[in-house]
C-alpha cells in the first residue's frame, strides 16, 4: 500500500493566505474570511509546483466570481475549485468583479496529478490530512 500525500503545509487553512487587495479576518473557528477591497483581488497560494493540482475548498455567496489564477481548472463543485498549476507566475484563488465580496477558505490541498486521479477514483474531491493510505 502506498500513500496519497497532501503537499500543502496548512491543509486546514488555519494560517492566513497572502491576500492581494483584500482584507483578512480570523473567525472563531480559526479559519479566515477574506473581503476584497478592489474589483479584482486574490489570495496568493505559495509553494505550488508546476504540474501539481491545487484544490481550494471555500465558502462564498459569489462563486461565479472566482477562478484559479495560473491554473487550468479541472474540477468545480459547490465548495471546491481545483486546477493544475501550469504557470511560473502567481497561483491564486482569484476574484474578478468582487469589491466587497467575501470568501472563507476552509481547506487547501496540493497533490501530484497521480494522487489527484486516485482521489477521484475513490469518489473524493478532497482530503485535508497529510497522508492517506491508497490502494496500488
Please place each PLM-identified region on the residue numbering:
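Extracellular polysaccharide-targeting segments
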Residues: 1-23, 32-36, 96-136
